[in-house]
Amino acid sequence: MTTVVSNAREIAAIDLGSNSFHMVVAKVVDQDLQLISRHKQRVRLAAGLDEQKNLDEESIQRGLECLAMFAERLQGFEPRNVRIAATHTLRQARNANLFIQRALDVLPFPIEIIPGSEEARLIYLGVAHTQPQADSMLVVDIGGGSTEMIIGKGFEAELLNSKQMGCVNFTERYFANGKLSRKNFAQAIVASEQKLESIASKYRKKGWQMAFGSSGTIKAIHEVLIGQGHEDGLITFERLSKLIEKLCEWDSIDDLQLPGLTDDRKPVFAAGVAILSAIFHGLNIKEMHFSDGALREGLLYEMEDRFKYSDIRLRTTENLAAKHLVDLEHAAKVKGHAREFLAQVANELGLPEGSELCDLLEWGALLHEVGLSINLQGFHRHSAYILRHNNMAGFNSEQQLVLSNLARFQRKSLKLNELDDFSLFKKKHIIGLIRVLRLAIVVNGQRNDDPLPPLTLSAKDDEWRLECEQPDWLENNKLLHADLQTEQEYWREVGWQLLF
């Protein structure tokens, strides 16, 4: 008897790394995630960054050609079933938005630029889901432009860092002439150890039960060690030291001939070995296992585990609110009105059903006063700074940018020329959220326990109207009336109309 599975669906995750782009496709069957295929293309994106931190046309073109190939596999996929994360190089690139806009022409799915801390958390999640459970794990991932180091238990990362040292940028800095020498290795190792100085003692003190390495650099080291006769593939400091001695037997990177070392990994292999050697020494790692799981697997598992994802963001916002002594009762009232107002004008704003901007508005409402912990004067700017620069687990860079802009424009004059540019979201939608949040804040400005009568918000282009079934509602709320008149003037200054 054959059982027909009706609830299977395919999901895909893409990792836009500094050295290579990776795609993994999986099938979700009931509660099981079955990997179907992996795809990898070396694009050397980091090599295209010039001195002004702009990507050159050649590297952009290499990236677009790879994404066009990925697009063939993803034909018919719904946007909710594809997640694309960009890492270090696109974090650094000043023209990242240009690349993302051109990428949308060949691969019509949103690209998220994720902070280093979020990259580290997702890497840990990918390893944790694909390895036997240990009481605690250290995970190290050496990418093209950055290295992530995470200690956690179960599926939760507890200590994480992302350092700007990768196999591509360290190759350019310490092996630029293609020469292999003890001097070049020593310089690269010392530079790596300097990057680790501020965090190494924390990692040693916290400790871990098992160490895992993920992604291309550590995979290559693992396979070369097997080729050297270490059948268990374990990485140790002693084996790394001997590997460096072995590499110095060649004068040039181009001449390297090692079993297990592929041609595409060869140019950046020496720098990767140097970085990992420094990490072993600085963190006092005894041995490391290789893990197939990494960032893209973390993206996959988080896509399917949506409740866990929501819990992470809820925990992040709650912790940030507690840290900055936010008045949660007041914030909840603002959040409630923001939710109601947005539901009333969402169609006019053109917001698609289920848009994540609805969630971001609620998070923004909860956190709009975090800046009060710094100073009452200009607290909206302080709030914006905190939300832009904090490590916020569960949020990518652009989501944090939305929160920051909501905080920045929650009150006072609307200097819209200071509004940031977005690649994942339309600016008109962000402006709509700003209007909604401002009104939710104004109607709760009295900060008292007297309930407001039910309010109705409607919008037609730049004319918005706030109404109440009780005709004399503002007669009984003189202070609110004055606040609305002040808000009305702020709107008038930018060509908007607020009626009430």
Curated annotation (Swiss-Prot):
One of its GO terms (molecular function) is exopolyphosphatase activity. It catalyses: [phosphate](n) + H2O = [phosphate](n-1) + phosphate + H(+). Its EC number is 3.6.1.11. Coiled coil: none annotated. GO terms for biological process: polyphosphate catabolic process. Degradation of inorganic polyphosphates (polyP). Releases orthophosphate processively from the ends of the polyP chain. Disulfide bonds: none annotated. It is found in: Cell membrane. Gene3D superfamilies: 3.30.420.40, 3.30.70.2260, Exopolyphosphatase. Domain 2 (3.30.420.150), Hypothetical protein af1432 (1.10.3210.10). This is Exopolyphosphatase. It is a peripheral membrane protein. Homodimer. InterPro entries: ATPase_NBD, Exopolyphosphatase, GppA/Ppx_hydrolase, Ppx_GppA_C, Ppx_GppA_N, PyroPPase_GppA_Ppx. SUPFAM superfamilies: Actin-like ATPase domain (SSF53067), HD-domain/PDEase-like (SSF109604). Keywords: Cell membrane, Hydrolase, Magnesium, Membrane. It comes from the Bacteria. It holds the Pfam family Ppx-GppA_III. GO terms for cellular component: plasma membrane. The gene is ppx. Its cofactor is Mg(2+). Belongs to the GppA/Ppx family. It is an enzyme of class 3 (hydrolase). Signal peptide: none annotated.
